[in-house]
Amino acid sequence: MGHFSEELQQVQTRINRFLEAQFEGIESHNAPLLEAMKYALLLGGKRVRPFLVYATGQMLGAEKQTLDYAAAAIEAIHAYSLIHDDLPAMDDDNLRRGHPTCHIQFDEATAILAGDALQSFAFEILTKTPNISTEQKLALIQILAQGAGVQGMCLGQSLDLISEHKQISLSELELIHRNKTGALLIAALKLGFICSPHFTDKRLEQSLTQYAEAIGLAFQVQDDILDIEGDSAEIGKQVGADLDLDKSTYPKLLGLSGAKQKAQDLYQSALSELEKIPFDTTVRALAEFIITRKS
């Protein structure tokens, strides 16, 4: 995992610099909006979604300069979603990545606007993507919009909110997280895929999608485990928040040991999909990172 950690750190450094550069020349007009956007987008984070964009795209021959734009766009969407998730009307969290959440650092109205603006910012960045065809550029916009909206992340959050204080089945829980967490991870792989010369290969797209579905669920299972076993200082947010909100989680439905086995099963499913892909791939190491991470 040492080699993978180095690659992840390189991605973090590259995407952070690129994201910072996207704000150059934008006037704040003394409003707090721009600072709130920067606060949410640039204040740390694992950058798993950008890593997936780069790893998939480079594996398939995409240019790194092209991938910068797709990676930045999906991270902007992710940052907006975290701002809104943390709001009092949603998950009501005060801590994110070891720092006060956006609505605590600024105020609730500014946080909402910062989330709105980051969503628009993501698509503005995508329209500037160089070295690809108009067809590919439109496909990037479509994939990110679908992954983030009513067929993906927003649907998952809505389902999650209405399931609070209710007993739900494992299949219902998986539906929530296939959308809330998994949809953007699938989008990340597809963005990298679309930026590559192989973007018309439907069989390859299918294997990548199934891999992403498995690691997307595994990511959430591990999140639920860390909400029980994690350390607040290490994971950068409050431990036990799911329990406080009476949310259905994998440990709640399967027990802690059952949840850990579920993560292992999903890891094996992800690896079996990668065996169908005839490329050397860093995304294999990502699957291991997801189920062993401590934050």
UniProtKB/Swiss-Prot annotation:
List of residues binding Mg(2+) 1: 85, 91
Cofactor binding remark: Binds 2 Mg(2+) ions per subunit.
Positions contributing to Mg(2+) 2 binding: 85, 91
Classification via Pfam families: polyprenyl_synt (PF00348)
GO molecular-function term, one example from the UniProt record: metal ion binding
Alphabetical UniProt keywords: Cytoplasm, Isoprene biosynthesis, Magnesium, Metal-binding, Transferase
GO CC terms of this entry: cytoplasm
Compartmental location: Cytoplasm
Gene Ontology BP, a term: isoprenoid biosynthetic process
Necessary cofactors: Mg(2+)
Keyword Transferase carried by entry: yes
Keyword Transferase annotated: yes
Parts of the chain that traverse the membrane: none
Residues noted as binding isopentenyl diphosphate in the record, renumbered to the chain: 46, 49, 78, 97
NCBIfam families recorded: FPPsyn (NF045485), PRK10581.1 (NF007877)
The family this protein is said to belong to: Belongs to the FPP/GGPP synthase family.
Full protein name: Farnesyl diphosphate synthase
Organism: Haemophilus influenzae (strain ATCC 51907 / DSM 11121 / KW20 / Rd)
